[in-house]
Amino acid sequence: MKRFSLKFMLFFILSLFSSFVYADGVFSKYYNGRFNYVINVPTTKYENGVGGTVNLDFAKNSNLIPTKNLFRAYEAANSDGLTIQDINGNIIILAYGSYFLNSEEVNGLSRETIRNSFEYDRLNYNLFLKKFYNGNLPKNIDPLKYDYNKNLFIYGENVAYNTIGKNFYVISYIEENKIVYKKVIYSKDSKAYIVFQASYLPKDKKFMDKLVVEMVNSIRY
């Protein structure tokens, strides 16, 4: 008869226990028809904007999610995307599409609309220009880069990570004692933005960082 060491048996029991603890964690596929994007979400269903419940297609099991009932999801009335919250309301995840990133873009994204927006929000317009545009806005303002720069300007020293690419940007910062992660992608096909944003407490950082990476990497458009 084969004998097993106490160390091996302890490891086996702990592994088995862990598998039971995380057995219910699943990702499901959410498809947004309005903006034509797909993302894996940590819930099996969502409430739509007219009071109904929609079941989502299974994507995969995951040990990143403690239980399938940890989150609840709601689709906006205009069908642009989902708001996902944990049962305590400490974690908020947004995934949505939009044709505009800010009011300046809605109003034409010109020097005048930007100046007016900064004055309304009591932001230092001249300092912003000096820091990001060498004191003068270009004639053709890149809306994605502008929004990225404005976020960097607003959150300043609270920014922990930031990067920008050809059709996306990522920024992570601290706001009201919460970690905020935001990724914005421009879809050339739909001529719209796909926005992912998650905010959570530092105590949830260990599992939420991994959850965010999983969700962001699953976005297709």
Q: What are these model-predicted stretches?
A:
Residues 53-183, 188-193:
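Conserved polar/disulfide-associated segments of primarily extracytoplasmic proteins
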Residues 32-64, 68:
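Proline-anchored loop/turn motifs at beta-strand termini and strand-loop-strand connectors
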Residues 37, 45-48, 190-221:
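Surface-exposed amphipathic alpha-helical segments
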Residues 1-9:
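Bacterial N-terminal signal peptides that target proteins for export
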Residues 21-25:
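Boundary at the C-terminal end of the N-terminal hydrophobic targeting segment
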Residues 10-15:
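Hydrophobic alpha-helical targeting segments used for export or membrane insertion
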Residues 35, 41, 78-80, 215:
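Residues that flank catalytic or metal-binding motifs in active/ligand-binding sites
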